[in-house]
A protein has these predicted regions:
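Low-complexity, Gly/Ser/Thr/Pro-rich intrinsically disordered linker/tail segments
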Residues: 194-224
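C-terminal soluble interaction/assembly domains
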Residues: 143, 152-168, 173-175, 194
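A short, well-ordered alpha-helical element
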Residues: 40-58
């Protein structure tokens, strides 16, 4: 699961870059965006540029495999381009005491639609077990939108606000200080299942093909 930067680079495929995202148009007129790190900034100008370039495409693949997270603001900015209305995407809880279960009542989280260019067609989001933290939150938001399907493997989880510390022996510890629940108030800390599970095939890999991208392309062709 290496995304645009590897398989397609070896095929000599051209792609554009806007902020932290790489994007291109595949042969069957399907748009493809690879966002490998939400720590890499993306602004509204970047998102306008990408969606304008891909606007004639019949469908869109957003690849966040191996995206270990980063800045939740970037993840939210991107998600806002895929809804036309304010959508409840989950809840967050905050620690209120030292007890194991001392948490506040769940506070709702909404994604508001962007007031700029918004994508109106089908979207497939590609995920794997290395999609963590802010990426997990992004995937959780995206699956609340009616035109979005998740394909690949379960995400790595780790939503919520991370807390980092160092133990006396020098080991680092990192955990979610504020549990994040989905819209049905279920925990998503341990990952989000795809709508369709697809594994990489060794044969495809040897032929410089990405099984999961190929499956997403097939699915988008069927739904067009």
């Amino acid at each position: 699961s290496r995304g645009l930067g590897d398989v397609y680079k070896r095929q000599g495929r051209d792609y554009r870059i806007a902020g932290g995202a790489k994007y291109t148009i595949l042969e069957d007129n399907i748009g493809y965006i690879y966002y490998g790190d939400f720590s890499s900034g993306i602004g509204n100008g970047n998102l306008d540029e990408i969606l304008l370039y891909l606007s004639a495409c019949n469908g869109l693949i957003i690849d966040v495999r191996n995206n270990g997270g980063g800045n939740l603001t970037n993840a939210t900015l991107m998600a806002q381009r895929f809804t036309n209305e304010k959508i409840l995407t989950g809840y967050i809880q905050h620690k209120t005491g030292k007890g194991h279960n001392d948490f506040s009542d769940p506070t709702p989280i909404y994604v508001e639609p962007s007031n700029s260019i918004r994508w109106q067609k089908k979207v497939i989001v590609l995920t794997n077990r290395h999609s963590y933290s802010a990426t997990n939150d992004f995937v959780n938001s995206m699956r609340c939108f009616p035109n979005v399907t998740l394909v690949g493997d379960k995400t790595g989880g780790g939503s919520g606000l991370p807390f980092s510390s160092e133990l006396p022996n020098g080991w680092g510890v990192r955990f979610s200080a504020s549990p994040h629940l989905d819209a049905q108030k279920q925990h998503i800390e341990f990952g989000i299942d795809p709508d369709k599970k697809v594994d990489m095939s060794k044969e495809d890999e040897n032929n410089d093909l990405d099984t999961i991208i190929e499956e997403a392309r097939k699915m988008l062709k069927v739904t067009l």
